[in-house]
UniProtKB/Swiss-Prot annotation:
Positions of modified residues (N6-lipoyllysine): K64
Domain of life: Bacteria
UniProt GO BP: glycine decarboxylation via glycine cleavage system
Species name: Paraburkholderia xenovorans (strain LB400)
Domain Lipoyl-binding per the UniProt entry, residue ranges: 23-104
Protein name per the record: Glycine cleavage system H protein
Length: 126
C-alpha cells in the first residue's frame, strides 16, 4: 500500500496536495480505494459552494459500498475531476493521480489539522 510522504491526509482517508496557487487538490487514499473495492461511480455534489471542514462534498460508490467524501478544510469547491466522473475505476488503479475535487481554502482554513504520511500510516495500522 502506498502512502506518499509529500501529501497531507485526513483521518477519513482523503489525501490533500497544496498547489502552487494555494488551492488544494483532494482524492482518496490507496487504503480507502482498497477497502472500497471496484469503484463504479463518483459525483461531486457541492461544486461552486462554500463548505466547512468535514462537510460531505462528494459521493463515491463501489460494488461493495457507497462512501461520502469530506472537505478536508473549509473553503469553496472550485473543480471536480471529470475524468474520474467518466471513468471512476481510475481511482483504483492510480489513487494519487486520480484526484476528485479542488478546494480554494478559506482564509481561516485549519490546514494544521491535516496529518502527515507517518501519522496517517499509524492511524490505519500500516
Amino acid at each position: 500500500m502506498s502512502i506518499p510522504a509529500d501529501l497531507k491526509y485526513t483521518e477519513s482517508h482523503e489525501w490533500v496536495r497544496t498547489e502552487a496557487d494555494g488551492t488544494l487538490t483532494v482524492g482518496i487514499t490507496d487504503h480507502a480505494q482498497e477497502a472500497l473495492g471496484d469503484i463504479v461511480f463518483f459525483e461531486v455534489q457541492e461544486l461552486g459552494k462554500t463548505v466547512s471542514a468535514g462537510d460531505t462534498v462528494a459521493v463515491i460508490e463501489s460494488v461493495k459500498a457507497a462512501s461520502d467524501i469530506y472537505a478536508p478544510v473549509s473553503g469553496e469547491i472550485i473543480e471536480a475531476n471529470s475524468a474520474v466522473a467518466d471513468t471512476p475505476d481510475l481511482v483504483n488503479s492510480t489513487p494519487y493521480e486520480s484526484w476528485l475535487f479542488k478546494i480554494k481554502p478559506a482564509a481561516d482554513a485549519a490546514l494544521d489539522r491535516l496529518i502527515d504520511a507517518d501519522a496517517y500510516s499509524k492511524s490505519i495500522g500500516a
